[in-house]
């Protein structure tokens, strides 16, 4: 642990903690300052001026990042309208019908997304307390409850990911890997920021985006210049 702390301390060298960097420069620094031996993620944290006790100020949805984020998303499809072979052909990792639902609690650590249609939702309702806190409960707002299950699987396997505000109005997301070209990560970040700006609730007063920072999986957080236009 001491060795890691020493590396992390060293990673802060050359970074002005009080300075906000242009987005490209901040991402480049985050890549250079990663201290993991593996190809870690580049993450973004966005602080929004939202009162999440108000339903209309709770942001949740999904976005297809233009360059993906490099993560292998493990998808479970629950449907009785398509075959296992059809689901597998578009990249689904697991597949089942109504009788498969009983297996879900045993495989929570093996799946990242559950995609289904409206007909299956009443059967999944009994697992709400298990799936909800883990962010696994299918939801039409993020495209995981849909009539076109196969298309949804393709999108999530290509890099479509969920975004949502936490209790304090923060959004945390992976927007790429350390090994990505910096411009590719910048494009992903801008796509997310533009989407969030377009979702600004009409009831928000004052500065909407209050803080932005990017960071590697292990390494320093770097402030980003905010453009609220």
Swiss-Prot record:
It comes from the Bacteria. GO terms for molecular function: rRNA binding; structural constituent of ribosome; tRNA binding. The keyword Ribonucleoprotein applies. One of its GO terms (cellular component) is large ribosomal subunit. PROSITE patterns: RIBOSOMAL_L1. GO terms for biological process: regulation of translation; translation. Keywords: Repressor, Ribonucleoprotein, Ribosomal protein, RNA-binding, rRNA-binding, Translation regulation, tRNA-binding. Part of the 50S ribosomal subunit. Belongs to the universal ribosomal protein uL1 family. PANTHER family: 54S RIBOSOMAL PROTEIN L1, MITOCHONDRIAL (PTHR36427), LARGE RIBOSOMAL SUBUNIT PROTEIN UL1M (PTHR36427:SF3). Binds directly to 23S rRNA. The L1 stalk is quite mobile in the ribosome, and is involved in E site tRNA release. This is Large ribosomal subunit protein uL1.
């Amino acid at each position: 642990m001491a060795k890691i702390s020493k590396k992390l301390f060293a990673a802060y060298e050359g970074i002005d903690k009080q300075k906000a960097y242009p987005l490209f420069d901040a991402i480049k620094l985050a890549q250079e300052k990663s201290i993991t031996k593996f190809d870690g993620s580049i993450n973004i944290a966005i602080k929004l001026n939202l009162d999440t006790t108000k339903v209309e100020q709770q942001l949740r949805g999904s976005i297809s990042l233009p360059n993906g984020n490099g993560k292998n998303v493990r998808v479970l499809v629950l449907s009785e309208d398509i075959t296992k072979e059809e689901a597998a052909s578009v990249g689904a990792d697991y597949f089942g019908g109504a009788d498969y639902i009983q297996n879900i609690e045993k495989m929570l650590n093996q799946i990242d997304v559950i995609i289904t249609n409206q007909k299956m939702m009443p059967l999944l309702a009994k697992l709400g307390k298990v799936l909800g806190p883990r962010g696994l409960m299918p939801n039409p707002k993020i495209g995981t409850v849909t009539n076109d299950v196969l298309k949804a699987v393709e999108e999530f396997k290509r890099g479509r990911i969920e975004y949502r505000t936490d209790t304090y109005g923060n959004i945390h997301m992976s927007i790429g890997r350390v090994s990505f070209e910096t411009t590719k990560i910048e494009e992903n970040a801008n796509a997310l920021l533009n989407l969030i700006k377009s979702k600004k609730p009409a009831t928000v007063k004052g500065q909407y985006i209050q803080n932005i920072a990017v960071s590697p999986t292990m390494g320093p957080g770097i402030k980003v210049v905010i453009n609220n236009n």
